């Protein structure tokens, strides 16, 4: 039975466990410890592996590795500590550097902000510290594992992962520009794409991962409000000089045609209209 190790098994990683198990993989997933987290991973069918990049040890041998590391706000670590330095520590803990490696990155590496259509050949010129860190992580991994596949995820949505739900239900105005572009991928579809690439041993790829249906932010929240039975959203502009919120600066259209050619048939949610109802079932 082939073995896959997930380094950083959070919201997306938990879904990947099921997708990999369904494809006949033995799945191992790292955790820094704690009974609740260990029990959670075991309940999903993964073998928990204790690993902390601040006190590193060795990681078990596997046929494939998926790195999907994210910052735990309670850890006191910075984004760079985890995404760059932590990734380097993880690579060094792997016994065989020839292992197939799949890295979950982000479309934040692109800096386009004027509605441009962006594919994998577009220049990476991030405009904020987060994007710079994510790009540095990609570069660090490729310097250590040249054959690694880089997966640049658009915004991940899914159950318990929808912003502004409370504001919509309360009828509060939303701050920002409803005409800015939004790029999305349902969590379960993202997990299926990664698992399919692992199974197909698609090494050395660079892929954007989205549903390939860019939408205006306003349209997304209008649909959310409709499903919630909430008032149609009202928008108010940002104040001059007000810092951008998370992901609000983004205003580009992600082209994921390359990914769709490899794994597009696996997508269950072709756009937000098909994906949102299941995400909001608990609010019905």
At which residue positions do the language-model features occur?
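NAD(P)-cofactor binding segment of oxidoreductase domains
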Residues: 62-102, 136
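Conserved Rossmann-fold NAD(P)-dependent oxidoreductase catalytic core, especially the SDR/UDP-sugar
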Residues: 89-127
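Glycine/proline-rich active-site loop of Rossmann-fold NAD(P)-dependent oxidoreductases
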Residues: 132-135, 144, 156-169, 196-207, ...
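Catalytic helix-loop patch of NAD(P)-dependent Rossmann-fold dehydrogenases
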Residues: 114-150
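A conserved pocket-lining segment of Rossmann-fold NAD(P)-dependent short-chain dehydrogenase/reductase
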Residues: 165-187
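N-terminal Rossmann-fold NAD(P) dinucleotide-binding loop
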Residues: 13-14
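C-terminal amphipathic/interface module of NAD(P)-dependent oxidoreductases
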Residues: 50-54, 247-284
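Mid/C-terminal beta-alpha module of Rossmann-like enzyme folds, strongest
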Residues: 193, 197-244
